[in-house]
């Protein structure tokens, strides 16, 4: 039997993008895609038909309107329709385009033909709707942090190994390798994320021994590394920090994101209590990335 999915489309002021994305994800949407046109943001999310009904969708529309009015904006337009699973698998792709990040990276949809001439390092991605497309501020902050750390690393960058904790699609591991790192350990508790990271590795033609993908967490990283990236929830990062001692050494650098600005102090305090020195905090919209190194 063919499964059906709700496709939810929200059009509102571009300043509401983060709030709309949060609301859709809280509602249960398995991935969102965003496109800006002039001063508007077009956001699309998907979730199984059986998960919600029309009354739930009407409530979502009301919440989105209330969110906007509270911030002094006009309510966004919210529409929804049912689509078949085959359409759901590809319909979101129309909203996602190549995205330049930092000075050297380019996130590139896998279904597009490769560019003939490109001075940037390509990160090819086909995440499906269950995982991010690399456009979220936290992902971009981590990618930019990787550029900085690998440019400023102690010793040859070709000797750097990186641990990617909570790897999702594996985009951060792939970026680290494209930027010159020797090896990346990509780990995630979610088996679907492990499958996605495996696909990303193959899509980018990276040898399995160079990007090692495993289900699990810090315990799957076999030895201390020179760099750590961790783009997950702040509460999870705080819980993980004590365990990072097993995979770090003096001068190991780390980039932590998935952190709201309002949560930053709690993460910084936890890091400093475990022997990390925070060097900088980068902010984008309501999110931040904490750059630190091990003393």
Curated annotation (Swiss-Prot):
Its EC number is 2.1.1.-. InterPro entries: Ribosomal_L11_MeTrfase_PrmA, Ribosomal_PrmA_MeTrfase, SAM-dependent_MTases_sf. One of its GO terms (molecular function) is protein-lysine N-methyltransferase activity. It is found in: Cytoplasm. Its main location: cytoplasm. S-adenosyl-L-methionine binds at residues 139, 166, 188, 231. GO terms for cellular component: cytoplasm. Keywords: Cytoplasm, Methyltransferase, S-adenosyl-L-methionine, Transferase. GO terms for biological process: methylation. The keyword rRNA-binding does not apply. It catalyses: L-lysyl-[protein] + 3 S-adenosyl-L-methionine = N(6),N(6),N(6)-trimethyl-L-lysyl-[protein] + 3 S-adenosyl-L-homocysteine + 3 H(+). It comes from the Bacteria. Belongs to the methyltransferase superfamily. PrmA family. Methylates ribosomal protein L11. HAMAP family: Methyltr_PrmA (MF_00735). This is Ribosomal protein L11 methyltransferase. It comes from Cyanothece sp. (strain PCC 7425 / ATCC 29141). The gene is prmA.
